[in-house]
Structure formats: C-alpha cells, structure tokens
Amino acid sequence: MERTELNAQPVVLDVDGSVGTLPGELRLPLQDWQEQVRFGCGLRRFAQFRAALDAQLPAAHGTALMGSGDFHHLSWPLIERCITAQALSAGRPLRVVVLDNHPDNMRFPWGVHCGSWVRRVALHPAVSHVHVAGITSGDIGRAHAWENYLTPLRAGRLSYWSAGVDTGWARRLGVDSAFRSFASVADLSRTLARMLREQAQPTYLSIDKDVFAPEVVRTNWDQGRMLESEAMDIIGALSGQIVGSDITGDVSSWRYATWWKRWMSAGDGQDTQIGAQ
C-alpha cells in the first residue's frame, strides 16, 4: 500500500496570504473568500466556497497548505475529495489522523467552523475512524464537556488522544472508550505511532501547528506540547499509508467584519490582531 502523496505537488489554498512560497507549488488565489469562510460560516456559503475550490483544484495534488488555523474546517471538503479520488467506501474506508491541540468537535449551531468540522468527517460512511491526537487543551475537560459533540464518540467513530487533561466526565457519560489519556505527549506519540504502524490502512493526515510546543513553532491559538521528533515518529509510522494530507496553523491577522466571528474568536482566546495594521 505504498503511497506517493507526500511527494506530489503541494497546493496552497491562499485565503490569507500566510503561507510562504514553496518549491513547485500550485497556489490558488482565494483571498476574496477570507471574511466569508475564515473561522466559520453557514453551510450554504461553505458550499459556494467548495464549488469555487473544486473549480480550481486538480484531482491529484500533494499536501494542501491552508494558512491560519482559522481555516481548519477546509479539511472537510479536502477529505471528501480524497475519498472520491481514491474510490474509498465503507468496504474500503479512510482513516483520518488529526494532530491538533483541540478536538475540533465542538458544538457550532450556525454551520461549520474550524472547531466543529471533525464531527462531519467522523460520521462520513467512508471514514472508518478519526483520531485527534496531541490534545492538551481544556476543550475536552470537565468545564467544556457539554460543548463536545457526543454522537461520533458514542458511535466509536472518533477518539481523543490527550495528555494532562482531566477527562473523568467521559466515564460518567459512557464515552470513556473514545478517550486515550496519557501522562505525557511522548507516551501518547509512541502509543499512537505503534498503533498506526500495526493497523495499516489508507490514511488522511491533517496537522494543525498548534499541536506543537511554542518552542517548536508559534501560532495564534493556545498551543500543545508535541515536539517535532514526536510528530515525525507518527508520520513515519504512516509510511506507505498516506493518501491525502493538509497543514494549517500559520499566523495571520484579520479584523472580522462579522460581529459573531469577533465575539467567538475572542471567546476562544485567539489573537487575530498579530501584526494587524
């Protein structure tokens, strides 16, 4: 099951101008969509963006770079495109591995946003399981338990891999089997890498740079504690299995014109004004 996706032409979804020039890149000019889709949007607007993306994106490409973590929900259409391109199905499903400091499975009643997209992917019939790994955020702690979508956790379609977070509430709600808790990110990474190596299957890898410790890279979201070597061990364990991938988490600033985006992004502790003029 050898794959060459990581060596194919990288594609930049250039919505916010934060991704530097890459050798051999394909860059899609999508800046006109920034206010509309950044952080989140309604499903109708997202469908319009997806149509614009489909019109420009080739069927085959390498890793997609999406800029700020505010655009992590763009992984949803990319994963569905991957499923179609690879002719995957319930009989031959896709596994999704997300390296992220947040679960991205939080309630959002107005459509989809960067913190809610995982639920939609996990419940796709051609996706066997989503593993969100590297979580040190309080988003899966007791105070925010009510914000997590429980359906994919209860259905056995989604697992949280975390370190240093009290997730005792999961046992009380009967979803503790979906939680893999570790004393350290190092233990988490070793265990995940071993599982991925032993249970090979077509895999989509999505990396949000906020999973990394601040000494590795700086983002404008609260960050985790993963080291570069630990991420590389996980990627190495997926050798020959990756059929699609994306990276998000670059730093960019944006002054939202939409009131609820200003309110929600501030409530999430995000700094959207880094370097803003």
Predicted segments — roles?
Residues 2-277:
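Conserved alpha-helical scaffold segments that buttress catalytic/binding sites
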